[in-house]
Design a protein with these regions (language model features):
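Fe-S-dependent hydro-lyases/dehydratases of central metabolism
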Residues: 1-208
C-alpha cells in the first residue's frame, strides 16, 4: 500500500491495517481493467460495503462496462452497495466521481496520491482486491482478512473530524481558479493525466 501524499512511500499493507476509511475507489487508467473488475467482484460477492463507507467503481472503457454487465458483475456490485459509474479514465482526478473531501480517508486504486490529486482528503493506494476488502471491513485490510462483521465506528467522531477539517480549509489562503501558460496540442491517443494536467499544479489551483 502507498501512504497518503507520496505514491513511492510504499509499505506492507499490514502496517496500515485497521486504519479507518470513509471511502474507497476502484478504477482509473491503471486499475479499471476487466481483470480488476473481476477481482473486485470476487471479493464483494455475497458481501456488503460497511456502513458509513462509500465504494465507487469506475471501469476504464465502455467495452469493459458492457462486459461487466454481460458477466453479471454490475449486479454483484449493486447487491454489495457499490456506486457504479459510467466508464472513464479520470475517476481518480479531483472533480470527478472519486474525489474525496476535507478530513476524508480514502483507499484507492488510482495511479497517484499527491495532495489534491483525488480531492482534499487523504488517499492510500492499493490493489483492487485490497480496496474492495477494505470497503467491506470499514478499515484497511486484505481480501484474506475480512471480518465477519464490519468495524463499528463512532459517527459523532467522524462528523467532528470532518467539521475540523472543513474549518481548517476555510482558513487556508485562497487559490486561483485560473492559471496562465502555453497550450500544447498533442495529437496522440496514449496521453496520461499528468500530461493533461500535471500533478505539480494540483495544489496551485482550487479544485472546487
Amino acid at each position: 500500500v502507498s501512504r497518503p501524499g507520496k505514491p513511492h512511500d510504499t509499505v506492507d499493507i499490514k502496517e496500515e491495517t485497521k486504519v479507518k476509511i470513509d471511502s474507497a475507489f476502484i478504477g482509473s487508467c491503471t486499475n479499471g481493467r476487466m481483470e480488476d473488475m473481476r477481482a473486485a467482484a470476487n471479493v464483494l460477492k455475497d458481501r456488503k460495503v460497511a456502513p458509513g463507507v462509500v465504494l465507487k467503481i469506475v471501469p476504464t472503457t465502455d467495452e469493459i462496462w458492457l462486459q461487466c454487465l454481460e458477466e453479471g458483475i454490475i449486479k454483484t456490485f449493486k447487491q454489495a452497495g457499490v456506486l457504479f459509474s459510467n466508464a472513464g479514465c479520470a475517476g481518480c482526478a479531483a472533480g470527478q466521481v472519486g474525489q474525496n473531501g476535507p478530513g476524508e480517508v480514502t483507499i484507492s486504486t488510482g495511479n497517484r496520491n499527491f495532495p489534491g490529486k483525488q480531492g482534499k482528503g487523504l488517499v492510500y493506494l492499493a490493489s483492487p482486491a485490497s480496496v474492495a476488502a477494505s470497503a467491506v471491513a470499514g478499515y484497511i485490510t486484505t481480501e484474506d482478512n475480512i471480518p465477519d462483521v464490519p468495524a463499528n465506528f463512532d459517527f459523532q467522531e467522524q462528523a467532528q473530524r470532518f467539521e475540523i477539517a472543513i474549518e481548517k480549509e476555510k482558513t487556508k489562503e485562497e487559490k486561483p481558479f485560473e492559471i496562465e501558460g502555453r497550450v500544447w496540442l498533442i495529437m496522440e491517443d496514449n496521453i496520461d493525466t499528468d500530461m493533461i494536467y500535471h500533478n505539480r499544479y494540483l495544489q496551485i489551483t482550487d479544485p472546487n
